[in-house]
Amino acid sequence: MLARQFSISSLVFLLIFLIQESVINQLRLPGGGFSLPLLIALTWAALSTPTVGALTGFISGFFMDLSQSSSGAMGHWTLLMILACYAVAFLGFGNDSVRGNPITNILLVSSASVLTLVAFVITGVLLGISFGSFGRVLITIMGNAFWVVLVTPLILPFVTRLHRALFGNQARI
């Protein structure tokens, strides 16, 4: 990733983080809502190479660690987002049916979002972080899955156009 692309991507994810903190967190959506930086990063990674996916995960994970609503240790989201975005980029990079089909991309991003939240809870428990009752965690993860399936089709065209403008013709949705 060139320095220009990395800088512009960082500014995009900073803007997404500010929108999440100032608007979406204030909405009090049922089921816990959704994380816009998580969705945008996973969608961005699905359109990218694994290297760009890992860098995307680093940028978005760093901003997610800075969030006031983050209950994990510093670096917790960063590590998980690097791994999740790399995995999504790896799955989507070599398979043109994933990159060329919006429905497959939506399913990939939605399932990766839920798996990332489950991994956050599991690694958080290993780190000694208190998340509350099992039922509340399950409601939050299921609520997030619901919102992700609703929001991902809405943001996919925007993210695809932005990714294509920044990285050229690698995104083909």
Feature annotation, model-predicted:
Residues 1-173:
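Terminal, non-globular segments
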